[in-house]
Each structure stands twice: as structure tokens, then as C-alpha cells.
Swiss-Prot record:
Keyword Endoplasmic reticulum: no
Entry's Gene Ontology cellular component terms: cytosol
Gene that encodes it: leuS
InterPro entries, per the entry: aa-tRNA-synth_I_CS, aa-tRNA-synth_Ia, Leu-tRNA-ligase, Leu_tRNA-synth_edit, M/V/L/I-tRNA-synth_anticd-bd, Methionyl/Leucyl_tRNA_Synth, Rossmann-like_a/b/a_fold, tRNAsynth_Ia_anticodon-bd
Family according to the record: Belongs to the class-I aminoacyl-tRNA synthetase family.
Pfam families for this protein: Anticodon_1, tRNA-synt_1, tRNA-synt_1_2, tRNA-synt_1g
Stretch forming the signal peptide: none
Provenance organism: Trichodesmium erythraeum (strain IMS101)
This protein's name: Leucine--tRNA ligase
Keyword Protein transport attributed: no
Motif ('KMSKS' region): 614-618
Enzyme class (EC, first level): ligase
Length: 929
């Protein structure tokens, strides 16, 4: 038995043991309450970073806690394994994406094991495997059959040199291709969409069903969905039998329309453009095509536009207004057209001033008919002017009347619109789930039959980063027969957005090896919704929104019976590292090259800026988790991550605090080992449990009772129990636990004899030192449990355990079984946080079974009751000393005890007491003359 704490060897030992025992296997439904603890699964980049460590440590503590609290726990892990980096590796290094990905998974899985996470690896999924994406494809077909998957033209990022589609992350800040350097263009392609807008209202309303989510996340989702109530209005085009449809939240301003704007990509743009304006319009469209969506909609960027020469009619006043195109109007958003009301919209006002367009006031703050020249847009409500039959009305009233007029006259109708757009899921990439559609010249888009799933990714693929998608180049793979009519047809060559893979993985985990169906609904309905989901705030919108959408669609398809996938959400903060930056050159300097006491650039001597930022390779401020574990062990890394900051706040890395947690674990190790050094295991058991199996056999009690008591002897700690509670109370408690029936009267009688014998042998009051220790223990149980069962304030829970260790270090009853119980309780409280050291000490102390399968300690309020308190004695307000008095003593008793004390006798001798002030439980002050 090594007396020195050696974390690396201990951790390796127990990780091997837990794996061999399959200790973290998910239990079957055994009538225990369930708890589904889930971290957002990682992309297999090959190495864990500290952000991963924080995320998964938080979830692991919760999972371990819930097991100890009597829950059956599902704590799985998998890999969000499709994505662009694997394809880039194939292009740059000639490594097949599958090989690169699977090697990274193997490496990261080993790193996760080294951190001691209690993951059920039998539930592992990887989204890039045919076994998984077969069901991703099947789910796509469920959407297709429900009318929720469709194709339409949409803009993509196009590299004109490499002749290929680029993902947003492949376009730099200047709008250039990451590989060729070409200015990226916008190009229209026919692509697949999911009709998430059909669920917009549900997605918005059901946020109210998520009280366990952070309010800011719900607000972000609500804003992203962006519900707007207004009107759809149509403006006839002069000289054409077509109309321009617009949506507005301010139909009360329609009489102030002075122009209409189309998106450059709008199908009507070419039709309304006059010959005189054709070159101007085409040139402008080409310029806009080179801009990203972010560039076009940036608020700090001047809005640009050109007139088409066409005109539209405002149906409310029959006035002709010019039709423009502008960069800030996007075809994919709303109707792809807006009505310009410069007097009452900030953006329209700026645009009108820039291009000298009319500005017509139709709402004023009062009924003064004030039509003065505006210096800025008036966007508030007010009184209608210059608005025909609505003049003089409140704009809030006129809004409804104008919608009714539009509906009566056929100009439009009331409408609810959402900022949320349908989800573009097509990707012109190889490393993703193939879309299971075959395009037939006769039948159109035909779903691949279920029996032909999965549509597997071909392995012999050339990756150049140029030209069409790699799949589109494989004629043998592309050319197939139509499943419906047998005509020569072609496979869909787009793959799915990787967000689709992560939108349903949490549903696969409970039934991860099912080969017959996407999942067994009975199993999924048992485990879902996820009880605690943990992940970064960066996923607050897309991933979480898409997962909610998927759950609702699959519910409507009869596959599950719950509305929301994640009952509680914890968004952990970032892990930040100390960052050094040269303000002169703008370069980041590796922290290893800097003297923290005098931070200067080692090359130039410039004084460096010092601040904390999210850890990243580019800023040279990252800390490798493997290095920390090699030096201090996984338990220390976990403890630091949990202690340094509340989970929802950003965490600043601090080597000194890492060392502080290492010292704390060393202290716990030393305390237990010192106790064991002075007590043999047999003596410890006799003292700690107070009764042995030999004692029971000698007294000839029933075999059933012997079995039950010895099996649960550690849980009862009978000696300590009967020192604190009456035998009758203990008897009732044990009867309740074993649920004895009336037919077991003999057993109950024997049990009473056992307890009476223990009382006679080990009875007696606890000493003051023992009471103090017991009070410290149960205060820690109370505080740690509340910290973990509430908002998961791990940092304060660790602080409470450190307080308990300090109290035990100062205790004067280290030979007492109460002290032994206290050490055991400390290990139990610490177990979810530092699983390896607690398991080792638990076993060394002679306990049976794993510390992680032991019941969580229960708080006893009686233990906090104080028998005596310290009473301060003052003379004329000056403290002269303290005495111990009964905690429940009344004022008269306190005064009496204070008067009789040696302190009072000494300081009051020969003095007249004018007044006595008694503050219960605090002090007695003698006012003397």
C-alpha cells in the first residue's frame, strides 16, 4: 500500500478495473427513476481541448451523483463525425476521410477514458458510419413523405476559379476563397430544404415548456424565430399582369410608400427592368453576387441600389411608385421585396435621402397635420395624415382597418410572418450523409426504397478541391435505374448538412445497436426527454432549434410521444487562457516565451498586452489537458475545472489554482492514510461498524437477520446510530428499509435484541469533539447536496468539501468511529468530482463494492442542533471573555450563568451593576457605575 498519492498509477488502475467490470453500463428499467445525462457530442478533431474537458466533467459529475442518489442513469457519448475538416485532410494530405476520422475517434476516446468519465461505451454512435447514417437517410425520407423536404433555387458561395461551391467557413473576411483566393460569387443552385417554418409557431410557443433552460437561450431562439404580425400586400406592376407581394408589420404606413424594392435575385427583376436600365441593373446584380449575405445586411454599411425603370401601383391611393433593386433585400427572406416608407422606417429614410426619393409623412405624433420636413424617420405610433379615409384616426386603430380594406378589395390580407427561414440542408460535399433521392426524367424526385438504405458513400474518390462535388464525378455511382419505373436515372449528389446528424443523435443513444429500426419507441419514450443537457452557448440557436424541430416532426410521425428533447439545459462558459499580444505588431506571443512578471516580446522588447481570451492555437494560449493529467492527474484537472468558476461563467486558467486542488487531494489522501496507519482493518471495522458477523453468530440470531445486517452494515453504521438515537427509532427505520411483514415477527424480535445489545456494549453520549465532527459532516452533506441538486454550483460544493477536510484535520477525536464515518462521508461527497482517488481510498479502507455505487449520504437535521453555544461577557461594552452555555437557555438563565462566571466575578468585584443587557445566543453586557 503506497503511502504517497500517485495519481497516474491510481487512475490507470481504476480505469482498467471499471472497463473490465463494465461498471458504467446503462441499467435496464428496474423501476428506479431514470436520469438521462448528456453532453453535446464532439467533432473528432483528434485531440480534446479544455472546453471539452469542462463540458464532459460537468456532465460526468451529474451522472455519478444521480447514480448514487438511486437513479438508473444513461450517460452516453458519440461523435459528430461528418464535416469539412476530414475532406480537407483528404485534399491536403491524401488521407481518406473515413480513415482520418476513425483514427481521430480512437485517439479522443482514449483521452476521454483517461479523464475517468463514467460513459456507457456500449451506446457509442458515430454519425459517419453506415449503421448511423442509414437512419439519418431514413429520417430524411420521413420528412420527404410528410411534405417537409423539398427543392428550390437558392444562392451558394461560388469559387469562379476552382469552379466549386464553398461553405461559409471557407470564405475569409474579405469574401475570398480560402484555397484559390478568388473573390467569391453568389450563384443560384437547385437545393434541398426542410420546411421548418411549418413548425415556427410550435417552436416559439413551446419555449414556455422549458423552465429548465436559461432565459437568454430561450430569448435567442425566440428572436431567431422572429414572429411578426402584419399584412401581406400586393402592388400591381404597371404594364404587366403581375404583382409584387410584400410583407409589412406597419400597414398603417402604406399611404407613405414612395418606392418598392426587389431583391436583385428576384425573378421579377428581369421582367420589370426597362431596356434603358438593363446594363445598369445587370452590372449591379453582378456586383451584389460577389457579396456575402452578412456584407449585404450589415447595419454599418451604406445601402446600395439602382432603379429598374419599372413602376408599380400603390392600390390604396392608385399612385405610381418606382421599382428599385437593392443589396439589403434578400430573396430568401420574406417575399424578397419590401415597400419603401422613408418617413417611418430608419433604413428606408437613409436609402431615400441617399437617392433623393420622395419622403411622405403619413403619421404624426398628434392631430396637428404636421407635414414639416423630417430630419429623421418617425417610427412611433400616432395619428394618421395624408392617408385618405383614415386621416385623423389613431394609427393603432387604422392598422386593423387597413388590413380589412385590403382583404375586402383584394389588395392583400393579414399575415403572421417569421424571421425563421426554411432550412437549407444541401451540401456540395463528399463527407456527409448522401441524400437518398434518385432523379428520374419521368417520375421526378424518387425516394430510395427503405430496403436499399443506406446509400453508402463510395470509397474510391478523388479529392481535388476543384470542380463539382466528388460524388458528382463518379458516374458508376451516380447512374442508376429509377426505383419506380426502371428508367435510367441519376442519384442526388448533394450530401446533408451535418446539423441533421446532430439533430437526432440523442434519440439513437438509448437504442444504439438496433439494426431493425431507427429506435424502439418504447425504449426512447422511457428515457427521453434528456434530463440534463450540457453544451456551449454557441449552440443556443441552430443545433438546439433543429433538435426541437426534429423531435416534433418525429412525434407527429408517431415515433415518440414527447414534445421537447431536452428538459434542462446548462450552457457552460468558455475556458480562457492568459493571452499575450504585441500591440505594435498585432502578433500573439506564446505564453511559454514570456516572463509573466515582466511580459515583453522576446524578439522586439515591446511591452505586451495581457488579457484572457478563449483558448485557441492561433493565440498560443491553450493548455493541453494531457499535459495537466501527466503532471497532476485527471482528478486534479476535474477538480480545478469544477472549482474555478460557476459552470455558466467563463473560466480563466490559473496554474496556481490547479496546484491548489492537487494539494487538497493530497490532504484527503494523507488524512485517510494517517487514520489507517493507526487502526488495523479489523479494529476499524469493529469500531466503525460496532458489530461483526462473529458477534451475531455467537448470539445465535436468525440467519436472515445476520445476512441482512452484515450486508448493510456499512450503510447503517449501527454503533454510531444507537449512540445518537433511541433503539426504538432505529428499529422503526430499519423495519421501513427492509419492509418486514407481520409474519416476520421473530426477525423483528431478534432485531430488537441486536440493537439493545449494541446499545449496552457501545452506548453512551457523544463527546463534544464527536458532536462537532458530526455537525461539520452533516453541514457538508446539506450544503453539497443543495449545491448539486439546485443549479449545479460545483465550485461552492468543492469549497464545502474543503471546509469539511479542514474541520476533520482540526478534530481531536481521530480515534473515534464518528471520525471514521466522517472520512467515509468525505469520500462519498468527493466521489463524483474525483472518482479515482475516492475509489482507491474507499477500497483501502476495507469497504465492499465501489464508492460510486454506494448511496449518497443523507442529511440529518438533528446533527446540526447545537447543545452549547459560546456566550460573550462584556463589561460596559468591552469584551472580557466567553463562557459555554446551553443553546436553548432563556434570558434569565443567561444572565444568571454570566453573573456566576469567573469572568464576571473578577471584573464586577466592588462595582454596582446599573443595567444588564442580554442578547440571546450572543452576549451579556453588564453596565456598571
Amino acid at each position: 500500500m503506497d503511502s504517497k498519492y500517485n495519481p497516474v498509477s491510481i487512475e490507470q488502475k481504476w480505469q482498467k478495473n471499471w472497463a473490465e467490470q463494465n461498471q458504467d453500463q446503462t441499467p435496464i428499467n428496474n423501476n428506479q427513476p431514470k436520469f438521462y445525462a448528456l453532453s453535446m457530442f464532439p467533432y473528432p478533431s483528434g485531440n480534446l481541448h479544455m472546453g471539452h474537458v469542462r463540458n464532459y466533467t460537468i456532465t460526468d459529475v451529474i451522472a455519478r451523483l444521480k447514480r448514487m442518489q438511486g437513479y438508473r442513469v444513461l450517460h452516453p457519448m458519440g461523435w459528430d463525425a461528418f464535416g469539412l475538416p476530414a475532406e480537407n485532410a483528404a485534399i491536403d494530405r491524401g488521407i481518406p476521410p473515413a480513415k482520418w476520422t476513425l483514427e481521430n475517434i480512437a485517439q479522443m476516446k482514449e483521452q476521454l477514458r483517461r479523464l475517468g468519465f463514467s460513459i456507457d461505451w456500449d451506446k457509442e454512435v458515430a454519425t459517419c458510419t453506415p449503421e448511423y447514417y442509414r437512419w439519418t437517410q431514413w429520417i430524411f425520407l420521413q420528412f420527404f413523405q410528410a411534405g417537409l423536404a423539398y427543392q428550390k433555387e437558392s444562392a451558394v458561395n461560388w469559387d469562379p476559379i476552382d469552379q466549386t461551391v464553398l461553405a461559409n467557413e471557407q470564405v475569409d473576411g474579405e469574401g475570398r476563397s480560402w484555397r484559390s483566393g478568388a473573390k467569391v460569387e453568389r450563384k443560384m443552385l437547385r437545393q434541398w430544404f426542410f420546411k421548418i417554418t411549418d413548425y415556427a409557431e410550435q417552436l416559439l410557443n413551446d419555449l414556455d415548456k422549458l423552465p429548465g433552460w436559461p432565459e437568454r437561450v430561450k430569448l435567442m431562439q425566440a428572436n431567431w424565430i422572429g414572429k411578426s404580425v402584419g399584412a401581406y400586400l400586393e402592388f400591381p406592376i404597371v404594364g404587366m399582369d403581375q404583382k409584387i407581394g410584400v410583407f409589412t408589420t406597419r400597414p398603417d404606413t402604406v399611404y407613405g410608400v414612395s418606392y418598392v424594392v426587389l431583391a436583385p435575385e428576384h425573378p421579377l427583376t428581369a421582367k420589370v427592368t426597362t431596356p434603358e436600365q438593363q446594363i445598369t441593373v445587370e452590372t449591379f446584380i453582378k456586383e451584389v453576387a460577389a457579396e456575402s449575405e452578412l456584407e449585404r445586411t450589415a447595419e454599418d454599411k451604406p445601402k446600395r441600389g439602382v432603379p429598374t425603370g419599372g413602376k408599380a401601383i400603390n392600390p390604396f391611393n392608385n399612385q405610381e411608385v418606382p421599382i428599385w433593386i437593392a443589396d439589403y433585400v434578400l430573396y430568401e427572406y420574406g417575399t424578397g421585396a419590401v415597400m419603401g416608407v422613408p418617413a417611418h422606417d430608419v433604413r428606408d429614410f437613409q436609402f431615400a435621402k441617399q437617392y433623393n426619393l420622395p419622403i411622405k409623412t403619413v403619421i404624426v405624433p398628434d392631430d396637428s397635420n404636421d407635414d414639416h420636413k423630417l430630419t429623421e424617420a418617425y417610427t412611433d405610433v400616432g395619428v394618421m395624415v395624408n392617408s385618405g379615409p383614415f386621416n385623423g384616426e389613431k394609427s393603432t386603430v387604422a392598422k386593423k382597418a387597413i388590413i380589412e380594406l385590403a382583404e375586402d378589395e383584394g389588395y392583400g390580407k393579414g399575415r403572421v410572418q417569421y424571421r425563421l427561414r426554411d432550412w437549407l440542408i444541401s451540401r456540395q460535399r463528399y463527407w456527409g450523409a448522401p441524400i437518398p433521392i434518385i432523379h428520374c426524367p419521368k417520375c421526378g424526385a424518387v425516394p430510395v426504397p427503405d430496403e436499399d438504405l443506406p446509400v453508402k458513400l463510395p470509397e474510391s474518390v478523388e479529392f481535388s478541391g476543384r470542380g463539382p462535388s466528388p460524388l458528382a464525378k463518379l458516374e458508376d455511382w451516380v447512374n442508376v435505374s429509377c426505383p419506380s419505373c426502371g428508367t435510367p436515372a441519376k442519384r442526388e449528389t448533394d450530401t446533408m448538412d451535418t446539423f441533421i446528424d446532430s439533430s437526432w443523435y440523442y434519440l439513437r443513444y438509448p437504442d444504439a445497436t438496433n439494426e431493425e429500426q431507427v429506435f424502439d419507441s418504447k425504449i426512447v419514450n422511457d428515457w427521453l426527454p434528456v434530463d440534463q443537457y450540457v453544451g456551449g452557448i454557441e449552440h443556443a440557436i441552430l443545433h438546439l432549434l433543429y433538435s426541437r424541430f426534429f423531435t416534433k416532426v418525429l412525434r407527429d410521425r408517431g415515433l415518440c410521444d414527447f414534445d421537447e428533447p431536452f428538459q434542462n439545459l446548462l450552457t457552460q462558459g468558455m475556458v480562457q487562457g492568459v493571452t499575450y499580444k504585441n500591440p505594435v505588431t498585432g502578433k500573439y506571443i506564446p505564453f511559454a516565451d514570456v516572463n509573466p512578471q515582466e511580459p515583453k516580446d522576446p524578439k522586439t522588447g515591446d511591452k505586451l498586452e495581457v488579457f484572457f481570451e478563449k483558448m485557441s492555437k492561433s493565440k498560443y494560449n491553450g493548455v493541453d489537458p494531457m499535459d495537466v493529467m501527466a503532471t497532476y492527474g485527471a482528478d486534479t484537472a476535474r477538480m480545478f475545472i469544477l472549482f474555478k468558476a460557476p459552470p455558466e461563467k467563463d473560466l480563466e486558467w490559473d496554474d496556481a489554482d490547479v496546484q491548489g486542488q492537487f494539494r487538497f487531494l493530497n490532504r484527503v489522501w494523507s488524512m485517510v492514510m494517517e487514520f489507517l496507519a493507526n487502526h488495523s482493518f479489523s479494529e476499524l471495522k469493529a469500531k466503525h461498524h460496532g458489530i461483526t458477523q462473529a458477534d451475531l453468530k455467537d448470539l445465535g440470531w436468525s440467519r436472515y437477520l445476520i445476512t441482512e445486517i452484515t450486508k448493510n452494515i456499512s450503510a447503517f453504521k449501527l454503533r454510531n446510530v444507537v449512540k445518537v438515537y433511541p433503539v426504538e427509532d432505529v428499529l422503526v427505520a430499519i423495519e421501513a428499509k427492509f419492509n418486514y411483514s407481520e409474519t416476520q415477527q421473530e426477525t423483528k424480535d431478534d432485531l430488537q435484541k441486536v440493537l439493545t445489545w449494541i446499545k449496552s456494549r457501545f452506548g453512551g453520549e457523544l463527546t463534544k469533539a464527536e458532536k462537532d465532527v458530526r455537525r461539520a459532516v452533516h453541514n457538508a452533506i446539506k450544503e453539497v447536496t443543495e449545491d448539486l441538486d439546485g443549479d449545479y454550483q460545483f465550485n461552492t460544493a468543492v469549497s464545502e468539501m474543503m471546509k469539511l477536510s479542514n474541520a476533520l484535520g482540526d478534530a481531536s477525536c481521530k480515534d473515534s468511529p464518528i471520525y471514521a464515518e466522517a472520512l467515509e462521508t468525505l469520500l462519498l461527497l468527493l466521489a463524483p468530482f474525483a472518482p479515482h482517488i475516492t475509489e482507491e481510498l474507499w477500497q483501502i479502507a476495507g469497504n465492499f463494492g465501489s464508492v460510486h455505487t454506494h448511496a449518497w449520504p443523507k442529511f440529518d437535521p438533528e446533527a446540526l442542533v447545537v447543545d452549547e453555544i459560546t456566550l460573550v461577557i462584556q463589561i460596559k461594552g468591552k469584551t472580557r471573555g466567553t463562557i459555554q452555555v446551553p443553546a436553548q437557555a432563556d434570558k434569565e438563565t443567561l444572565e444568571k450563568l454570566a453573573r456566576e462566571s469567573d469572568i464576571a466575578q473578577r471584573h464586577l468585584a466592588g462595582k454596582e451593576i446599573k443595567k444588564v443587557i442580554v442578547v440571546p445566543r450572543k452576549l451579556v453586557n453588564f453596565v456598571v457605575i
